[in-house]
């Protein structure tokens, strides 16, 4: 009898959340689902969003991380047959690379016999990403605040001298979310290039105040505070020219049941927090604002994914018969 495949679901994420630049992330309710089994040769079958990108075996991010991790550990990488069901927009600020890197690491541990814990996988993924915010939310689920603790370099072993510190923030409210996704992707490197190297004390203090207020507002379910708490001086003003959805939608904060608006990750997608009773009105207002600006976007209604795969690591998911 053939061994059952290994199945893993990795949620999309929205990081930065306005002022919490490189420090907070939120897991979203749509995901990359990976099914893998040992095979004679590497192969990938993909369905869903960006399936043509996901199906490329050559230079495949999941498989590259899988092979490189086992090579660094001195282990052989058994060929895998992957089946991917993807709902995460690629290159649009929704954590697609974090999900892929976590998938590759999880596959390396599962099929390469590495004695890594969930913490080891998270630390390795954060090193590969260069910052922990997306991988923390994807791996642990919910709202996660995190802190880098040293230079990020690809690991050669599961234990790193200074792994990131993370903390899940309990949410008293099931936040309703809307993600506005444009047609064109934006490389994170390009979005980083436009940021200044130095910030003023005034801007630093403003962001610190807003970030602290934001985390507590999300924890307590205080939607009335989000419009102010999502204000940012560190990255959104500089990325607005690359992410035209943001200036088009930011004026909607506090109106039409839209509680707050922020760039999703480095963009170009935009995350909106909604009042529970105003989803239809909010979507209509977003479409009208986009129309006035001559813009188009796909609107994805979702909620916070409260648990990530790292919370159940070791309890392998199995496909139903």
Residue ranges and their predicted role:
Residues 30, 40, 142, 181-186, ...:
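Glycine-rich beta-alpha junction loops
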Residues 38, 148, 182, 272-276:
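Short beta-strand-to-loop capping motifs
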Residues 218-321:
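Glycine-rich, charge-dense phosphate/pyrophosphate-binding loop(s)
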Residues 1-92, 110, 114-116, 151, ...:
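ATP-binding N-lobe of GHMP and related small-molecule kinases
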Residues 30, 92-118, 139-144, 148-149:
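DPxDG-like acidic metal-binding loop motif
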Residues 181-241:
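Active-site rim beta-loop-alpha module in soluble metabolic enzymes
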Residues 116-175, 241, 261-263, 268-271:
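Alpha/beta catalytic cores of group-transfer enzymes, especially the acyltransferase/condensing modules
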Residues 1-2, 16, 25-28, 74, ...:
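Solvent-exposed alpha-helices and their adjacent loops that cap or buttress functional pockets
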């Amino acid at each position: 009898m053939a061994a059952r495949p290994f199945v893993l679901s990795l949620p999309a994420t929205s990081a930065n959340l306005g002022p919490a630049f490189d420090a907070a992330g939120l897991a979203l309710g749509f995901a990359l689902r990976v099914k893998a089994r040992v095979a004679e040769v590497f192969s990938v079958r993909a369905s869903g969003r960006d399936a043509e990108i996901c199906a490329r075996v050559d230079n495949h991010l999941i498989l590259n991380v899988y092979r490189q991790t086992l090579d660094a550990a001195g282990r052989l990488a058994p060929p895998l047959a992957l089946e991917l069901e993807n709902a995460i927009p690629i290159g649009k600020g929704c954590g697609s690379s974090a999900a892929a890197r976590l998938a590759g690491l999880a596959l390396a541990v599962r099929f390469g016999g590495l004695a890594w814990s969930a913490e080891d996988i998270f630390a390795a993924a954060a090193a590969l990403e260069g910052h922990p915010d997306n991988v923390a939310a994807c791996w642990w689920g919910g709202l996660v605040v995190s802190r880098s603790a040293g230079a990020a370099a690809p690991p050669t072993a599961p234990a790193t001298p200074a792994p990131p510190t993370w903390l899940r923030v309990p949410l008293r409210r099931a936040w309703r979310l809307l993600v506005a996704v444009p047609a064109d992707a934006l490389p994170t490197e390009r979005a980083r290039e436009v940021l200044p190297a130095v910030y003023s004390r005034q801007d630093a203090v403003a962001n610190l105040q807003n970030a602290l207020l934001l985390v507590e507002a999300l924890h307590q379910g205080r939607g009335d505070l989000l419009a102010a708490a999502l204000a940012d001086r560190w990255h959104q003003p500089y990325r607005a020219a690359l992410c035209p959805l943001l200036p088009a939608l930011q004026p909607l904060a506090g109106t039409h049941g839209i509680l707050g608006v922020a760039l999703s990750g480095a963009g170009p997608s935009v995350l909106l927090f909604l009042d529970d009773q105003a989803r239809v009105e909010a979507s209509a207002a977003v479409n009208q604002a986009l129309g006035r600006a001559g813009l188009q976007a796909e609107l994805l209604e979702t909620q916070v994914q409260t648990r990530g795969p790292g919370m159940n690591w070791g309890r392998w998911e199995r496909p139903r018969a």
